[in-house]
């Protein structure tokens, strides 16, 4: 059993970001033209020059910086990069803007599990392969808390009933990866608590991925059996053996 320790710096950052995104929501809530197509650009325009500089804390924002996908192509696994220093530690928080229904219990796509693993483990390849070797120094720095990484969600309710901001590390619900499309999915109003530490989060994510892949594998095996049965029936029909005992 993994002890889920609270990441205190991440708890501070989460509080600061909630305050910031409350301001952002107040600036856009009465804009009837805001929708899922222009939300990203609007948020970026409001935050690209925004800076917090306090004792032991510096926060800045920029467009996504991804070595594989381009921001212009709208294919990056997040929409806004928050970065800076807290208590002498560098941090990166990848933020995904969403325009949806806060009252719905439906799970919504965030990004593929592959993208989340890339971001948290510092993997610089598009797809996971057996040739990938994890950067031990980088991951150890994150496990030990010397470097902070997180993924945040900013949700604007499409019916203008408010907003939410939270980190994936704060979600108390079980993680879910859709076995059909490999998407990490969440409800927009999940149960939240203090953010868990890096190791506990990544392990929880990998466990959810493994569960999803096992479901997918079992489904594929069943489909193979069904297709083989159909093929045999098709051959028998062609050879005039249908209806025979």
Curated annotation (Swiss-Prot):
Highest rank taxon of the organism: Archaea
Keyword Ion transport: no
GO MF annotation: an example: DNA binding
Species of provenance: Methanocaldococcus jannaschii (strain ATCC 43067 / DSM 2661 / JAL-1 / JCM 10045 / NBRC 100440) (Methanococcus jannaschii)
Function of the molecule: A P subtype restriction enzyme that recognizes the double-stranded sequence 5'-GTNNAC-3'; the cleavage site is unknown.
Keyword terms: DNA-binding, Endonuclease, Hydrolase, Nuclease, Restriction system
Broad class of enzyme this protein falls into: hydrolase
EC number: 3.1.21.4
Disulfide-bond pairs as recorded: none
GO BP annotation list: DNA restriction-modification system
Reaction equations catalysed: Endonucleolytic cleavage of DNA to give specific double-stranded fragments with terminal 5'-phosphates
Protein's UniProt name: Type II restriction enzyme MjaIV
């Amino acid at each position: 059993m993994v002890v889920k320790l609270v990441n205190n710096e991440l708890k501070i950052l989460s509080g600061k970001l909630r305050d910031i995104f409350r301001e952002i929501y107040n600036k856009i809530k009465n804009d009837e033209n805001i929708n899922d197509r222009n939300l990203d650009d609007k948020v970026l325009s409001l935050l690209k020059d925004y800076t917090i500089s306090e004792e032991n804390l510096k926060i800045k924002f920029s467009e996504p910086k991804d070595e594989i996908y381009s921001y212009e192509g709208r294919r990056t696994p997040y929409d806004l990069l928050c970065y800076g220093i807290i208590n002498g530690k560098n941090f990166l928080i990848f933020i995904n803007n969403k325009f949806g229904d806060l009252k719905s219990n439906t799970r919504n796509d965030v990004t593929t599990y592959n993208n989340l693993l890339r971001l948290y483990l510092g993997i610089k390849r598009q797809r996971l392969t057996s040739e990938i070797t994890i950067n031990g120094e980088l991951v150890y720095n994150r496990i030990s808390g010397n470097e902070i990484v997180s993924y945040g969600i900013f949700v604007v309710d499409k019916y203008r009933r408010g907003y939410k901001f939270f980190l994936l590390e704060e979600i108390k619900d079980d993680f879910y990866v859709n076995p059909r499309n490999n998407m990490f999915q969440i409800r927009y109003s999940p149960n939240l608590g203090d953010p868990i530490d890096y190791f506990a989060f990544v392990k929880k994510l990998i466990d959810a991925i493994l569960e999803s892949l096992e479901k997918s594998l079992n489904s594929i095996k069943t489909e193979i059996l069904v297709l083989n049965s159909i093929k045999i029936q098709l051959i028998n029909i062609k050879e005039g053996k249908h209806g025979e005992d």
